[in-house]
Amino acid sequence: MAGFIGKERHSIDEKGRLMIPARFRRKFADAGSCDGGASEYGRFGALYVMKTSDGSLELYEPSVWEGMGKSISALSDFNPEERLLKTLMYECLEMVELDRQGRIPLSREFLEHAGISGEVVILGADTKMIVWEPARLRGVVDGSSGRFAALAGRYF
């Protein structure tokens, strides 16, 4: 099955909640991770939200995050670099539950990190969704447009 693909604009409501696009929520239902039944991830499913170094937020389904979490858990607490990586990863991570309307709450810390106060752009990026403040995303895209061909040539 195809992952998350596409781009949508949504608004953060006055309580800091973000509506997950219906087409992305349908992907959860198809995968069985958001069927409305009680589970360890809440009645309507959950997402892992991570702050990123580029100023965006990444949203992962539990099944995707579990694979990443296993890799992180395998790092040694006795190796200073590996322990630092664990600390940095978990410091920027939250798990949030979807409500009946398909919204997730975003903490003030995460909203401030991403510069979000109103409208957002949600990009489907295969195994994750990336949430951007629109002007910040436009700045990244405009500032990198000349690099697209070189990057694509290098990796494809």
Curated annotation (Swiss-Prot):
GO terms for biological process: negative regulation of DNA-templated transcription initiation. One of its GO terms (molecular function) is transcription cis-regulatory region binding. InterPro entries: MraZ, MraZ_C, MraZ_dom, MraZ_N, MraZ_sf, SpoVT-AbrB_dom, SpoVT-AbrB_sf. Pfam families: MraZ. It is found in: Cytoplasm, Nucleoid. It comes from the Bacteria. Keywords: Cytoplasm, DNA-binding, Repeat, Transcription, Transcription regulation. Belongs to the MraZ family. This is Transcriptional regulator MraZ. It comes from Chlorobium phaeovibrioides (strain DSM 265 / 1930). The gene is mraZ.
